[in-house]
From Swiss-Prot:
It is found in: Nucleus; Cytoplasm. This is 26S proteasome non-ATPase regulatory subunit 2 homolog A. Its main location: nucleus. Component of the 19S regulatory particle (RP/PA700) base subcomplex of the 26S proteasome. The 26S proteasome is composed of a core protease (CP), known as the 20S proteasome, capped at one or both ends by the 19S regulatory particle (RP/PA700). The RP/PA700 complex is composed of at least 17 different subunits in two subcomplexes, the base and the lid, which form the portions proximal and distal to the 20S proteolytic core, respectively. Interacts with JMJ27. The modification O-acetylthreonine is found at residue 219. Keywords: Acetylation, Cytoplasm, Immunity, Innate immunity, Isopeptide bond, Nucleus, Proteasome, Repeat, Ubl conjugation. One of its GO terms (cellular component) is proteasome complex. Residues 14-37 have a biased composition (Basic and acidic residues). Residues 1-44 are annotated as: Disordered. Expressed in stems, leaves, buds, flowers, siliques and developing seeds. The gene is RPN1A. Signal peptide: none annotated. InterPro entries: 26S_Psome_Rpn1, ARM-like, ARM-type_fold, Proteasome/cyclosome_rpt, RPN1_C, RPN1_N.
Amino acid sequence: MAPTQDPNSVGGGAKKDEATLKVPSKDPKKKDEKKDEDLSEEDLELKQNLELYVERVQDPNPELQKAALESMRQEIRASTSSMTSVPKPLKFLRPHYGTLKAFHETMADSDLKKYLSDILSVLALTMSADGERESLRFRLIGTEGDIGSWGHEYVRNLAGEIAQEYTKRQSEEASIDDLMELVQQIVAFHMKHNAETEAVDLLMDVEDLDLLLEHVDKTNFKRTCNYLTSAARYLPGPDDMLVLDISYMIYMKFEEYPNALQIALFLDNTQYVKQVFTSCTDLLKKKQFCYMIARHGITFELDDEMVADDDDREALQDIVNNTKLSEGYLTLARDIEVMEAKTPEDIYKAHLLDGRASSGASVDSARQNLAATFVNAFVNAGFGQDKLMTVPSDSTTGSSGNWLFKNKEHGKTSAAASLGMIQLWDVDSGLSQLDKYFHSNDNPIIAGALLGVGIVNCGIKNDCDPALALLGDYIDKEDSSVRIGAIMGLGISYAGSQNDQIRNKLSPILNDAKAPLDVIAFASLSLGMIYVGSCNEEVAQSIIFALMDRSEAELGDALTRFLPLGLGLLYLGKQESVEATAEVSKTFNEKIRKYCDMTLLSCAYAGTGNVLKVQDLLAQCGEHLEKGDIHQGPAVLGLAMVAMSEELGVDMEIRSLERMLQYGEQNIRRAVPLALGLLCISNPKVTVMDTLSRLSHDTDSEVAMSAIISLGLIGAGTNNARIAGMLRNLSSYYYKDMSLLFCVRIAQGLVHMGKGLLTLSPFHSERFLLSPTALAGIVTLLHACLDMKPIILGKYHYVLYFLVLAMQPRMMLTVDENLKPLSVPVRVGQAVDVVGQAGRPKTITGFQTHSTPVLLAAGERAELATDKYIPLSPILEGFIILKENPDYREE
């Protein structure tokens, strides 16, 4: 066998490209002589040998043929193991490809013919014309040998040809068995050589992902599943669900339970969640699962199959019920030293502004006080103390009663409810503080207390159902504000619980001819939240009948929009399941028909990133309509809802919203800021911030109000200094306009929400999981903001409290095996996407080291900076249980 050529030697290097590009000359002899002069001796020898083999292959003597083929095969194999440039033997055999092919046709079937097929198959790698798939054709009639020995590039090329051939055979309905045998070989080869992504791509092309389960092993299953889960985002349904199913099975096979649980939650498959619990035997791990379920916000009952011991089961159910949330949040607050209560004035920072604005604001107007109530509630949310509502009543500076009465009628509702927000997640203390309002004779105060009870219980489940016990009796009272307080309270406290007792109480209201429209609207919303994403037929029927019973005048009312929204929430993220209901909605009155259609479509595909639905919604937004058509608002919001699931979609959506601002009609421009607010919620991107800042000075006050609220949403819970500065300047710019000033105040409250410890983002677990209840709360607020004047600036401002459904601490808190806080060093930095990269790349960049508990901003990831402990969850967010590492040695 000739020695292989050193790639740097002059002969090889100079001719590398030339040889492959030259057009055959008229006088082959002359050309050959010229070419031979340029080759080094080794190359020349190789070339002559190969030419000799080609002649010998055509020799009638089978012995000679066999020897020649064997030598040729050796030459090719020796050179194809590395594929940086076209290997020499392939280059020199180019002119003879046709000759060999023609001779191959004439050979009788024998082992020698198969041998030649193998060689032709490799030559076809560089020679065959596009779309001929010759490499594959020769491979299929060649020997059954190991394909890997011909090198990586060859296998890769084969995989590409198989995909094309498969599609062709599928359309002709021909047999694919021979292809599948080859696929088996290729997948095995790829999985052995760290090319999991290519193996997965091939299996997706031939629609046989189940093969993966046989080929994954301990070394590559994580990389394989990572690739599968990130690819699922870009696949059309139902393929995406299938891919996730496979990765769930792989995780279960290797007992990687936390990851399997995440996929089970993503698929919203209770059977899978149960399976994770029953398969895992480690109680500590089960506790970690419970924290994950609690963060996701679904109602989940453990049974004796999942946890055998009664005491253990009770302890675990407590974690699922989120009873530990308040305690963990306050631990974080103490650690960061932000327990000191803040007043609205601390947030407004009016002293930083020029004189004229701050002087005008000293007037004690009801609208200003209402704004201060909300700011106070958002900023001190969950801390259990503030300076307006929880002051002891005998203090000289003014008591909680005083602040309550600084608000006018319906303002008192929001003020009383704000006490629930301040006591957020601390059920016992919250209920005892709200108790005094139940004895009031003032209906708005009772309504606020009822709503407050709902807020305190938000996301916290309790066996004795205090919220239902307290609120159930008030649903059928005379006064509609009290009824709304009770209904909204139930909707917030039981969101996602699918509680039938409450359905039996609320459904009759929808079909009660005497009930006022606002009560019906809120009942529909609450039912939508309690049954969010459940596709419950009975609730859907009740809401549909309620919509059909509305008169022309009622359909024009701003609150009517909550009926289709309640209906949409039932199908949140459930894709095709909405189609039957969408058909029914086409029979509604034309005033509401399109609005309903857009709302259903956008809810059903929320967070799926479905490109076709984005196109449908864009088409709706492109129409230039008469005044009075309101369905484009939800279509614009729908764009954001569908596209928000992954970064690429978000960036594309931001660009198309920019276009809409330039070319869209007025009603579209009003919704665009809200859509931007949803896309970047609690994630203040500078470009979006600048767009909203520009829109906040728009001549159309509706656009300006939407933009201001959205500035609050994108900065929610971040304490972002730049947004805070913008809002301060806006407060002096709009100091004469009460409505706009109210919006500025609300936005200021949102930016400083929870003193910077909370987030409104419905995504968690590194943006993989979307919490349905959180999204429901945000979307409800955004739909209300499509028509600000009658709702948020009218007497239904307490709709703002729906945001509590999305409020979550943006913390990472490590606890020991007894669930007591444990401080360990962690690195926090920008998350890096490492899917499909070789080796073990760093997963975070630009990190700082802190000791836990720590705050995580949008797009940040944490990793432990010590080997002393092993975290029980691969994703460090929320509550993380640490187990001591038995192999750790102190240095």
